[in-house]
């Protein structure tokens, strides 16, 4: 007698549950719910949003109506022939080049990047091919250049605290999985890959959120290049976003999550590395579109 009423209550609830369950399964099956969750996740992780950026040299449009987003902890490769607009674009993102129009948001806020200091203050660091190292200084002195640790002698005479700078440099290198045994050597005596590591470490000391790298593996041997690649991957594991300019598609496909192709100042396309081919990217660089499409 008790079972029948309970059963009668259960059947309507069951009948309501089945359609809802089927609706969920069908939507999930066709990717609608999954796609929305991905979009929401990406939206919440947008670190930088560039909208309709324009930069001209006289009558030449070096960057022509370019828009894209950078997500937290991703490696974003920027590729294209010489003169495509890559370097001009990243100079604008680092405050080294004024923009004619367009907008930039960083960490959810509109920003004006008029000078490199503006970029530095919000957590954007740049590594150019020149590296900007002082050859006569050792590793800690280069890492702390411009932000040296000081101590007081006799309570009032400032002096560089070389012990603390060396200690913190080693800790920083270890944090990012870097083995650099000759930290007391002048950087002029270091290899190309080691010098690259020192320059990157100087940026990491500032707790950057986005690092822009111009040809980071240029002129490096296989072993040296592998060390720099590993460091970049370790940076990503710490949720640091990275924009890499490179002509080496082998490195790009090893590193990047997404690839942006530029030609004649325009953004041709942005593709996921996992779902494209080197041939497709070469076609976009050469012809401005994938010839297979």
Identify the meaning behind each predicted range:
Residues 35-293:
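Glycine-rich phosphate-binding loops of nucleotide-dependent enzymes
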Residues 4, 11, 33-36, 264:
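N-terminal leader/targeting segments
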Residues 26-33:
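Short, Lys/Arg-enriched N-terminal segments with co-localized hydrophobic residues
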Residues 3-20:
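Long, intrinsically disordered low-complexity tandem-repeat segments
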């Amino acid at each position: 007698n008790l079972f029948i009423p309970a059963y009668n209550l259960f059947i309507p609830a069951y009948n309501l549950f089945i359609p809802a369950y089927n609706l969920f399964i069908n939507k999930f099956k066709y990717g609608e719910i999954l796609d929305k969750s991905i979009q929401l996740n990406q939206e919440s992780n947008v670190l930088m949003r560039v909208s309709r950026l324009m930069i001209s040299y006289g009558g030449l449009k070096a960057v022509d109506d370019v828009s894209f987003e950078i997500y937290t902890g991703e490696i974003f490769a920027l590729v294209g022939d010489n003169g495509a607009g890559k370097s001009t674009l990243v100079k604008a993102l680092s405050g080294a080049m004024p923009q004619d129009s367009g907008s930039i948001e960083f960490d959810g806020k509109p920003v004006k990047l008029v000078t490199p200091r503006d970029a530095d203050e919000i957590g954007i660091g740049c590594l150019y091919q020149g590296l900007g190292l002082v050859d006569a200084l050792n590793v800690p002195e280069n890492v702390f250049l411009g932000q040296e640790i000081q101590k007081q002698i006799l309570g009032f005479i400032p002096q560089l605290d070389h012990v603390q700078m060396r200690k913190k440099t080693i800790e920083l290198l270890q944090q990012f999985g870097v083995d650099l045994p000759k930290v007391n050597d002048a950087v002029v005596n270091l290899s190309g890959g080691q010098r690259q590591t020192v320059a990157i470490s100087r940026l990491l000391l500032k707790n950057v959120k986005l690092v822009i790298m111009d040809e980071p593996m240029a002129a490096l041997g296989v072993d040296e290049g592998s060390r720099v690649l590993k460091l970049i991957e370790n940076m990503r594991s710490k949720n640091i976003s990275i924009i890499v300019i490179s002509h080496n598609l082998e490195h790009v496909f090893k590193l990047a999550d997404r690839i942006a192709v530029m030609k004649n100042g325009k953004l041709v396309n942005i593709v996921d590395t996992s779902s494209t081919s080197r041939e497709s990217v070469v076609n976009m660089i050469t012809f401005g579109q994938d010839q297979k499409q």
